[in-house]
Structures are given as C-alpha cells and as structure tokens.
C-alpha cells in the first residue's frame, strides 16, 4: 500500500523530480544544498508518495510541496494551503500516483483545519477532474512605454515635495503593509503575508531578485511595483509582476514611473487584476495588447466546516445542497446550510440526498464560495442545478459575486 509522508532527507530526489518536471530544457543540475536550499527554497513542506512504508524506500513515486498560508475570503481570513511542485518522473506516470497524492494532501489539510487549497496548474483540465477550478483571471497589458505618457501628463502637477519614488529592499518590507492591506481588502483570496513571505517570495526571485519601488505620498506608501527588466539592449521589457495602487492617483503615478523607462526598455508588460482600469484610463487603448488568462485554481477542503465558518449577509436561509466530489468521501454527499444573523451552520445529512435544493460539483461550489462565479452564472453554464428560481435567489444572496485575485506564484 502506498505511503504518503514528509521528505525530510531526500531533498536531492525532490530537486531531481522538480527539475525534470518543470525545467527539463536545462537538464537536471547536480543537487547543491548551498545553491538549491536557499531560504526561498525551504519554505513550505515537502511530501512524497512512496510504494511502501519501508524507511529505506528513498524513491517516491511522486512529490509535492505544501505552503501553509492564510487568505481572505468574504471579509475573513481562512487557513489556505498552496499546493505546488507536483512532480512525477516518467517511469511512474499514468499509474494513479498523483490522484493518491492529491487525496492524501487534502486529508492532511483537513487535519490542519485548512479551508481552501490553491494551486497553479500545468493543465486546467487535469486538476478540474479532481475538484479544483479557476479562482480568478489574470490580465496582462503590454505596450511601448510612450503609450503610458498620458499618466506622466496627468501627474505633472503633483506636488514634488510630498510625493517620491523609493527603491525598497527586503528589510523595508513592512513599509508596504498598509498599501498591500488595501489590496487585500479589495480582493478575495489575497494572501496574508508574513515577513518570511515578503522577503523570500516577493523581494526574492528564482534566478534573480526583482526591483521593488514604492510610491510615497505624504510619507506613506500609496502604491508599489514589483518588476524585472528582461532581454538584451535594444529589446528590453519592463515586466511588472505586482502592481498595487491604493487609489486612482497612485495608479497614474505607477504608470508614469513605467513610462519614465522609455530610454531603457522597448516594451512594458503589466500583470494585474481584471478590474485595474488601465485600458479605461489610457489615451490610446488601441496601442495596448491585452491578454486575459485563467489564474490559479481553488478547492474547498471540507464543505461542512467551510460553510460553517464563512461570514454571510444578514439574512435567514435554509438550503439542502448536494455536492459531487471525485476525490474525498467527506465532501461527496448532501449538506444542509442554515444561515441566521450572518453566521452559517453546514451539516452533512443523508435525508435530502434524493431531493436537494441545489446540486453542483465541488469545483463549482468552490468558485461560488470565494466569489469568482455567481449562482446564476454557474446555472447558465450547466455547472449548477436548482429545483427552482428561489434556490438560485437564495444562493445569490448568500454568496454575492466579489472581485477575486490570487497573484502570488509558487
């Protein structure tokens, strides 16, 4: 019987599996703890699925990493697990090992009272069949720096004595907290970042560290950019991986900052949430290439516990919900959700299994709960079945759509 357990010692094996899975074009470089065990690489918990429980079995069939995080959902912070580095060597593929690894991972999350699992998929179809589904869109805008000159024109009258751009280092990460908190309150699934995450995942990069510049107004950070400059002389791109602005003026200042690189770069690439109005404020939106892609995927770990911990609008409701979960037996069944005074109670029941008010899969329920998909959208796309329109109306009241954005990569 397969054994799921931590990988405390076989870090060279984890390194080999991960290198082959995600960067095969570079070969598999020899494991060097000084190079491959930097602080960024040691965050999270490594796990492996082994053929046996034998202690001398040093060759897992597949591996993964769990990041123990917290994310904001409907105004409250909930324990969230980032699932990453899922890798299987060719000789063990298509034997059901990853399915077992995912099932064991969810069981471990449940033991730790984790409410949501988030991952960045190599293929959406693959993880969708196991119950994860898209949590948000990611919008990438690309243009020549000159296209952003409108922002410089708009900010020319700003008080130079009260505004300044300042380059920050990892030791300055606390200066960004207030601006990031504004961002976190705006978007569902935004992470609660501790100092270690700021240092090693925001200020620290895989092969090189990004630049981090803050826009300060009256001695307070009103916005910031995390970016790299890629390419060779004459073909450089300023690539922004994180853009946070507390208000419209701060957004214009950040765009103007990018425009001011027109002597250094030929293109500017901005990665941002879908509601950041870059095309709306641009003077020449037709000169901006905009691409919308699916972001990470989210999954509820335990339906009954999660429904009981969420905050709801101040209303009363009683719904029977049938959930299909291909991976966990504790979620595959019927639940009664009772809401009163903004709090809910979700209990697993059997009496309503044949006559629920609502029927949907765990992936669709996850999207509904975090706010990415509305009940009406899920019904319209065949992802949710309801006995009548009142059930849809109740779900719409309990789970109104919200802006969601989980931009942290791992």
Predicted regions and their residues:
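Conserved acetyl-CoA pyrophosphate-binding loop and the N-cap/start of the following alpha-helix
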Residues: 92-101, 249-253
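Short amphipathic alpha-helix that is part of the acyltransferase structural core
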Residues: 1-62, 82, 150-197, 237
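A conserved beta-turn-beta hairpin within the catalytic core of GNAT-like acetyltransferases
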Residues: 71-82, 93, 112, 232-239
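A short, internal acetyl-CoA/4′-phosphopantetheine-binding micro-motif in the GNAT/acyltransferase core
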Residues: 83-93, 239-248
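Conserved GNAT acetyl-CoA-binding A-motif
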Residues: 102, 109-121, 263-273
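Intrinsically disordered, low-complexity, positively biased terminal segments
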Residues: 2-15, 164-410
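Conserved active-site alpha-helix within GNAT-family acetyltransferase domains
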Residues: 114-115, 121-140, 275-291
């Amino acid at each position: 019987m397969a054994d799921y357990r931590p990988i405390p010692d076989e870090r060279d094996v984890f390194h080999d599996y991960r290198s082959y899975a995600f960067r095969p074009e570079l070969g598999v470089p020899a494991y060097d703890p000084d190079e491959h065990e930097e602080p960024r690489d040691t965050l999270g918990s490594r796990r492996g699925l082994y053929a046996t429980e034998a202690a001398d079995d040093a060759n897992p069939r597949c591996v993964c990493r769990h990041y123990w995080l917290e994310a904001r959902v409907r105004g409250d912070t909930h324990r969230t697990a980032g699932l990453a580095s899922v890798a299987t060597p060719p000789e063990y593929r298509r034997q059901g090992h990853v399915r077992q690894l995912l099932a064991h991972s969810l069981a471990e999350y449940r033991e730790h009272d984790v409410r949501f699992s988030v991952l960045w998929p190599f293929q959406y179809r693959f993880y969708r069949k196991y119950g994860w589904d898209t949590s948000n869109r990611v919008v990438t805008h690309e243009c020549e720096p000159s296209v952003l000159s409108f922002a410089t024109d708009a900010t020319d009258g700003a008080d130079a004595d009260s505004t300044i751009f300042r380059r920050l280092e990892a030791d300055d990460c606390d200066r960004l907290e207030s601006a990031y908190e504004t961002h976190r309150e705006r978007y569902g699934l935004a992470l609660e970042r501790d100092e270690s995450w700021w240092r090693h995942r925001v200020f620290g990069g895989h092969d090189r560290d990004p630049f981090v510049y803050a826009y300060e107004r009256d001695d307070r950070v009103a916005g910031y950019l995390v970016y790299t400059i890629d390419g060779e002389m004459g073909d450089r791109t300023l690539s922004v991986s994180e853009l946070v602005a507390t208000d419209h003026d701060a957004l214009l200042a950040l765009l103007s900052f990018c425009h001011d690189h027109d002597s250094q770069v030929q293109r500017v690439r901005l990665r941002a949430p879908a509601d950041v109005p870059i095309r709306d404020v641009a003077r020449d939106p037709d000169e901006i290439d905009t691409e919308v892609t699916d972001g990470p995927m989210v999954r509820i770990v335990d339906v009954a516990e999660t429904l009981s911990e969420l905050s709801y609008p101040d209303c009363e409701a009683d719904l029977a919900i049938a959930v299909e979960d291909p991976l966990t037996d504790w979620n595959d069944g019927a639940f009664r959700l009772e809401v009163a005074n903004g709090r809910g109670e979700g209990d697993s029941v059997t009496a309503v299994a044949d006559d629920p008010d609502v029927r949907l899969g765990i992936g669709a329920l996850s999207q509904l709960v975090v706010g990415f998909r509305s009940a009406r959208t899920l019904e319209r796309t065949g992802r949710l079945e309801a006995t009548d329109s009142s059930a849809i109306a109740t779900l719409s009241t309990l789970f109104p759509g919200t802006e969601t954005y989980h931009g942290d990569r791992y």
